[in-house]
Amino acid sequence: MTQVAPSHLQTSNVFEDMLVVDTDVHVHESPGELAPYCDMPWRVALENIADRPETYLDIPSFSPGVSDGSYQAKFPTAHEGARMVWTKEQMRTELNQLDVDLGLLFPDHLLKLPVLTQTEYAAAIARAYNRWLVDKWTSQKDGLLGLIVACTHDPQDAAKEIAKYADHPDMVGVYLPCAGLDPLWGNPKYHPIFEAAQYHELPVLLHSVTVTHPVFPFNNHGFDTELARHTTSHTFSIMSNLVDMVTRGTFTRFPRLKVGVSEAGISWMPWLMMRMDKEYLERRRDVPFLREKPSHYLKKVYICTQPIEEPDDLADLVKVMELYDGEDTTMFASDWPHHDFDHPMKFAQVPFTDEVRRKVMGENALRFLNIDSTGRKL
C-alpha cells in the first residue's frame, strides 16, 4: 500500500531553488518481489520463502547476517524494519516531502550479498535484482536512478551485468557491497568489475552495513552492544577497503575510474589521509607503483555524508571537510527510509557558504554520476 510521508518530514523552502541529489536511498527487495526475475533453479528457493512474513532473519541464505551459525547479526532490528518503501510512487512522494530532486537507489537485503555462501545463488539474486530494479523502480522522469549490483562472488558475471545495463538511461553507476566481504576490494580478483566500470564510464560506490562475521573488519563479536558494533562496522569497512585499494594499486591501474563511498560519515577521512601518508614515507618500498602520496588518491574519492557526525559546534563539520579538501567531492546522502536517516534540513544548519552547500547538496553528485540536473546521462 502506498503511504504518504509523515508531515513532520516536510522541509521549509530552504532548498526551493537548490538542486538536491540524495546519493543513498534504499528500495526494499523482498524474496517474493525478486522471484519472478530470478533464473531457475534459484527462483524456486525464492518462491518457497516468498509468502513468509517480512522478518528478515528467518530467510535462509537470502540475506543472512552471517554464514557461520555461531555468529548473529543484529540488522535489521524490529525498529529498523518498521519503515519500508514498497513502490516508486511511494518513494517519489516521500522524497518530494524531503525536497529531494534525484534519488540514487541502493538495495536493502543485498547490502549483505557478500555473506552468501553459494556463488551461483548469489549471482542469480544479483541478476534478479538488476532486472527487478529497472522494471519496477528506476525512472529518470521520476528522478529515481539505479545502481547495478556487482556480485562479489563472480566478478566475470558482474562485469557482464555492467555491460548489459551500461547504456540503460536509468542506471548510472555500480554498487559494490562491502558487508562481510572477503577479500577486500583491492584484490585483483575484482579487476573485471573495475575494468568494466571504467570502460563504460560508470562510477562505483562502496556501501557497507553492520554485520558480525568472521572476516576482517567485521569480526566484531567482541562487542556486546549494537552501539559499539554500529560505531565501527560501517566506517572500518570503508576505511579498510580504501586502504586495500590504494596499497594494491587499484587507483593507478584504473586511473579513469570514479570511486565513491557511502554510509560511513566523513570525519575519518582526514585521519586516514594523514596516517597513510605517514606510513608511505616510511614504507614506500611496499608500493613502488604509487606515483603520489596516498592522500592524492583518497582526495579523488567521493564521499557521501550519511551518517553525518553531529558535533556540538556544527562549524566543526566545515573544518573537517576542509581537512580532506572535500568541497568538490562530498555528496549529500540521507539513507531514506531507514530509521537513522539524515534530514536535508540538518545541512541548512551547517555554516557552509552558499556555494559549498550547493555543491554538497547536488552539484558534486551530478559530476560524479555524469548526469544533468534532470538525471539524464551526459
Could you say what each language-model-derived stretch is?
Residues 2-21, 32-102, 131, 135, ...:
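Mid-to-C-terminal alpha-helical segments outside catalytic/metal-binding sites
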Residues 3, 137-145, 150, 154-156, ...:
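Catalytic pocket-lining loop regions of alpha/beta-barrel enzymes
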Residues 21-23, 206, 262, 333-334:
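Active-site flanking residues adjacent to catalytic metal/cofactor-binding acidic residues
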Residues 25-27, 210, 266, 338:
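Short, glycine/acidic-enriched loop or turn micro-motifs at the edges of active sites
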Residues 27-28, 38-49, 124-125, 141-159:
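N-terminal-biased segments
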Residues 32-35, 117, 216-220, 271-275, ...:
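Short aromatic-enriched loop/helix-cap "lid" or pocket-rim segments at secondary-structure transitions
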Residues 74-81, 92-116, 143-151, 172-176:
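Divalent metal-dependent hydrolysis catalytic cores, especially in the metallo-beta-lactamase
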Residues 81-89, 125-131, 182-192:
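Aromatic- and glycine-enriched glycan-recognition loops and surfaces
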